[in-house]
Structure formats: structure tokens, C-alpha cells
Amino acid sequence: MSGSKYKPAPLATLPSTLDPAEYDVSPETRRAQVERLSIRARLKREYLLQYNDPKRVSHIEDPALIRWTYARSANIYPNFRPTPKNSLLGAVAGFGPLIFWYYVFKTDRDRKERLIQEGKLDRKFNISY
């Protein structure tokens, strides 16, 4: 077993304990990790202070969540790229119902007109016989 090497699964990441870079970290990388952890701890402490405040009267606004919501919903046009698929879907969604209802009404009207001309349709509320 001493010669066997760990082979990661194709869709799973390598565990950090088996990653050789986990223990051979340069001072700059370690400094960046410590800085990120300190920012995260500060933000977490700030959130917990707001969350556990007994005099809180409104909800806590998370700026990252607000930015994400804005980018997801209200700001779609700068991120929109027209493609043939988008164009086809837009045409189907825009003109498809119009064409469908035109076909339904036109065929129904033509069928009734043909039955009237053949005298097979009983027109109950016809005023001008």
C-alpha cells in the first residue's frame, strides 16, 4: 500500500489534506489567506452583532445580496447577448400566440361560413332571414 497513489474522482476535488500545495505555501499566499479570513471574520462578527441586536427594528441589509439581486434581475440588458436561439425563442413567444389564435379564429369562421352557405347551420338569433 505504500506505493499506491491517491487518484481523485473526475467530478470531485482533491481534499485539501492531500493537496501538496497545502503545506508548501509561500508567505504571500499565506498572507492573502490570513487577510481573507480576517475580512470574513470581521464581516461575520458585524452580521452577528446586527442579527442579535435586541433593539433591531428593521431587517439586515446585506450589500452582497443586494448587488447579486440587482445583477440577477434588474440589470439583464448589459449582460444579454443576442444569439440565434434567443432570437428564435423571442419570435416564437411574440408571434406564436398571434399566429395560433389567427388560425383558430379563421378556421372556425370559415367552417361556419361554409355550413351557412350549405344551409346546415341553424342560426338561432339571426334577425335578417
Swiss-Prot record:
Localization of this protein: Mitochondrion inner membrane
Phosphoprotein listed as a keyword: yes
Assigned GO CC terms: mitochondrial inner membrane; mitochondrion; nucleoplasm; respiratory chain complex I
InterPro entries xref list: NADH_UbQ_OxRdtase_NDUFB4_su
Chief location: mitochondrion
Subunit note: Complex I is composed of 45 different subunits.
Gene behind the chain: Ndufb4
Family: Belongs to the complex I NDUFB4 subunit family.
Bilayer topology: Single-pass membrane protein
Keyword Electron transport included in the entry's annotation: yes
A Gene Ontology biological process term: aerobic respiration
Signal peptide as annotated in the record: none
Positions where Phosphoserine occurs in the chain: S26
Protein name: NADH dehydrogenase [ubiquinone] 1 beta subcomplex subunit 4
Function: Accessory subunit of the mitochondrial membrane respiratory chain NADH dehydrogenase (Complex I), that is believed not to be involved in catalysis. Complex I functions in the transfer of electrons from NADH to the respiratory chain. The immediate electron acceptor for the enzyme is believed to be ubiquinone.
